[in-house]
Amino acid sequence: MHAVRYTQAFIPTLKEAPADAQVASHKLLVRAGFIRQLGAGIYDYLPLAKRSLTKIEAIVREEMNAIGGQEFFLPALHPAEIWKESGRWEVMGDNMFRLKDRKGGDYGLGMTHEEIFTAIARDELRSYRQLPQVWYQIQTKFRDEPRPKSGLLRVRQFTMKDAYSFDVDRAGLDKSYEDQRQAYEKIFTRCGLDFVAVQAHSGSMGGSESSEFMVRTDAGEDLVAACPRCRYAANTETATSRVAAEADGPGLAAPEKFPTPGVVTIEALEQAPHSVPARRQLKTLVYMADERPVIAVVRGDQELNEAKLQTATGAQVVRPAHAEEIPPLMGAHAGSLGAVRFTRARVVVDPSLADRKDMVTGANEDGFHLRGVDVRRDLLAHGATLAELRTVKAGEGCPRCDGALEVFKALEVGHIFKLGTKYSESMKATVLDAGGKQVPIVMGSYGIGVERILAAAIELHHDDNGIVFPMAIAPFHATVLTLGPEPELRKAAEEVVAALGKEGVEVLFDDRDERAGVKFKDADLLGIPIRVAVGKKGLAAGNVEWKLRRGGAVELVPLGEVARKAAEAVRAATT
């Protein structure tokens, strides 16, 4: 195997990280010469990054092929018409890069490829006998991120492995989904990631069920609620919990209005002279679900989770109502709102409030509130419905056992979806089943962010000196360097490099005319798993210095054994 010489390689290391780099992976990828920024959320991948990304793609490809996946390569440029068939041309909004051709035709740059793969299935699949099918690609995607940041964690151009399964029924989908789940676990394990699979919100993808694969790191932007006792885990967009029951008084026979001039926040109502604890207040929020008003009600000290509201309403898009949209509907401004006996829009109440009595809420009249509200009597009896709305908090009870939930930041590296017939119905992709009936194809969608795996691995595996790469995705397995300018050291190092190459070990040969300290620092920064140093004293005894990047002590290894030792280390870490 051919070694790469440092003097011929392009490895533009830096002593300092960019001032705008906040997370470890961003700092180290720039300092170690893996990436450079071209624009906001747009990066050049330099040779070291390309080597690691190619290895990640190879692992993904192997595991996809192992479950019967067939690789495609589809266009990144999509005509608008195909996205309009599924209804997502409008739903994607500003997140999609859009352009017109010279004839005025509308196009989008693909964020994902459900529509394109569904169109192929519609045009080519005719019978249940052709199913199941598992199709995938590793392709460039585009997303117009409003706030690109954190290096490779939030970008506008990225590489995704997106796979799609096509089955004749739900049972087939269940099997395809499980196959993908197991393949994902193998991929992330091989890439050196410590991950957890969690229940997740499907968002604009749609479908009945989805799971995210999360890496626990403070660099993540998602929040996961997990129980250390029973291993329940879910994104806070879907997580549920047990909350302690409140001992309410009997309340009043009917809600009673009282003046609250200038009181427009939960916190203000907690203060004297009213002194109403937040847990006894009903927080009433006005949202637009697919541009239709919906009223969400949670406890005063709880936060509404917009993803849960989207699930509860079945809407494609939810947003807070604008300030000017609220008074015509509610009769008051924000801060004085309530849902007591309200029937002008759909009202959704969090289940934790179902049996609450003697509550306080806005009176839908500026400067007034209502006390003595009985949720069941005054809201549910008038058409309000129950649905999970609140965001769970750390310390609340696990919904599956007696344990307490912890909540932590996490980074999503993969997401799998049971799409069902969402796309096949809207795009009329059907096959004949065994009974001769035309049925919509049952689909699944499965995505992995390739660059995110690289960044996540670095977030998990680094120290004060640099990257500590897992062997399977390191740009090189080993680096060989000399500890002096003497010709005999160079000659011995060349022999070591050649022996390593014969054993299939990928080598970066640091042949620079630099001090040993500089070479050691760069080796640590680059994170190459094995370091072999050839020095005058060791060579006189027939030895070289051996050190593992992951916390290993320096060992003396006989010159003739180092290649075998390295090959064994590589095999042990990659098989």
Curated annotation (Swiss-Prot):
Coiled coil: none annotated. Keywords: Aminoacyl-tRNA synthetase, ATP-binding, Cytoplasm, Ligase, Nucleotide-binding, Protein biosynthesis. One of its GO terms (cellular component) is cytosol. Its EC number is 6.1.1.15. SUPFAM superfamilies: Class II aaRS ABD-related, Class II aaRS and biotin synthetases, YbaK/ProRS associated domain. Its main location: cytoplasm. The keyword Coiled coil does not apply. It is found in: Cytoplasm. The keyword Protein transport does not apply. It catalyses: tRNA(Pro) + L-proline + ATP = L-prolyl-tRNA(Pro) + AMP + diphosphate. Consists of three domains: the N-terminal catalytic domain, the editing domain and the C-terminal anticodon-binding domain. Belongs to the class-II aminoacyl-tRNA synthetase family. ProS type 1 subfamily. PANTHER family: MITOCHONDRIAL RIBOSOME PROTEIN L39/PROLYL-TRNA LIGASE FAMILY MEMBER, PROLINE--TRNA LIGASE. Catalyzes the attachment of proline to tRNA(Pro) in a two-step reaction: proline is first activated by ATP to form Pro-AMP and then transferred to the acceptor end of tRNA(Pro). As ProRS can inadvertently accommodate and process non-cognate amino acids such as alanine and cysteine, to avoid such errors it has two additional distinct editing activities against alanine. One activity is designated as 'pretransfer' editing and involves the tRNA(Pro)-independent hydrolysis of activated Ala-AMP. This is Proline--tRNA ligase 1. It comes from Anaeromyxobacter dehalogenans (strain 2CP-C). The gene is proS1.
